[in-house]
Amino acid sequence: MQPYTSRKIWLIIAGLICLSSVSCFANPLYVNVPSTPYDRQMTRIRPVLFSGSAASKQDVSMALVNHWMGDLRSIPYGFSMEWKTPAEVQTGAAADCKGKAVALYEMMHSRGAEDLRLVIGKRTVTSRKTHAWLEWTISGGTYVLDPTINWTACRADRLGNSSYIPLYAYAGARKYRAATATLYAKSHLQAGQKVASNL
């Protein structure tokens, strides 16, 4: 008696090939969630995230985004326990990653930027504290916008797996938990094995 039929083996092999190709990408996958551990802290900036765009269409160029990033990067770093509003960032003497990311989010969103996410995660795999930045997906790819560290936008696919590791993201009223493609593939592999065992 054979423990596995050839059909089951081929299904498992095909599933592994498909899932391994998904796990080759460094970009995270975002899973919609009803809440995040940061929701209470985000109260002050919720109006920025939830505001509608004044622009009828996307009117944001990479040159303009890089200009805004440079302006925000030139603001001295100063940690704040609470999330500063964009107005507080623009008028204050210093701002941290949270304030700078939210200020850039507001500038871009007001000009109609789409596929824009405020991300909370780790700057590097060895980071002990969390960091905030934006991710912006356009036809040319996904860009990491970090006005605390960088003067210009960076293509996400050129950063590798050891930097800008997302944990949670906000896009308007939507909230997400990040799942790496490897974890996504692993969970779907387990689900695929359950299906294959039922054949």
Q: What name fits each language-model region?
A:
Residues I12-S21:
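Bacterial N-terminal signal peptides
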Residues Y4, S23-L199:
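A structural boundary/capping signal
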